[in-house]
Amino acid sequence: MKLRGRKVVGGKAEGELIVSKKPLSFLGGVDPETGIVTDAESDIRGQSIAGKILAFPRGKGSTVGSYVIYALKKNGKAPKAIIVGEAETIVATGAIIAGIPMVQGIDVSKLKTGQRVRINADEGEVEVLDG
């Protein structure tokens, strides 16, 4: 299955998906030292986003969340790429400063944790490789 969205940050990545059906706050919601989701309201609480393709509907919370994304990258705990339904300023800025490929305009309800995907953010494409 191929899904088409729009580029926020260019680049390519392939890997395992971790999908949240809820908006995600990076400040106080993701530990920048470990990449573990700590937000008590998150449906992926306790799971690591490190080295995975992270998909969620949109970001929420403080603008400091952008710097949490940057810290995740500097600590080697960032996702390989980000897929969102709606790219709001916090997550988009974080992906830009961290150099993480990002695509917006994707219906994340069509994606499942554990699937393998290939992202060509330059073209706004997300391809599900299995399941």
From Swiss-Prot:
Family per similarity comment: Belongs to the AcnX type II small subunit family.
Alphabetically sorted, this entry's keywords are:
Isoprene biosynthesis, Lyase
Q: Show the active-site residues.
A: 62
Q: What is the top-level taxon of the source organism?
A: Archaea
Query: What Pfam families does this protein's entry cite?
Result: AcnX_swivel_put (PF01989)
What's this chain's function?
Component of a hydro-lyase that catalyzes the dehydration of mevalonate 5-phosphate (MVA5P) to form trans-anhydromevalonate 5-phosphate (tAHMP). Involved in the archaeal mevalonate (MVA) pathway, which provides fundamental precursors for isoprenoid biosynthesis, such as isopentenyl diphosphate (IPP) and dimethylallyl diphosphate (DMAPP).
Q: In which pathway does it act?
A: Isoprenoid biosynthesis; isopentenyl diphosphate biosynthesis via mevalonate pathway
* Biological process (GO), any one: isopentenyl diphosphate biosynthetic process, mevalonate pathway
The record's EC number reads 4.2.1.182
Q: Which HAMAP family match?
A: PMDh_S (MF_00078)
Keyword Lyase belongs to the record: yes
Instruction: Quote the protein name from its UniProt record.
Output: Phosphomevalonate dehydratase small subunit
Reaction catalyzed: (R)-5-phosphomevalonate = (2E)-3-methyl-5-phosphooxypent-2-enoate + H2O
- InterPro entries the UniProt entry points to: PMDh-S-like, PMDh-S-like_dom, PMDh_S
Subunit relationships: Heterodimer composed of a large subunit (PMDh-L) and a small subunit (PMDh-S).
Q: What class of enzyme is it?
A: lyase
Gene Ontology molecular-function annotations: hydro-lyase activity
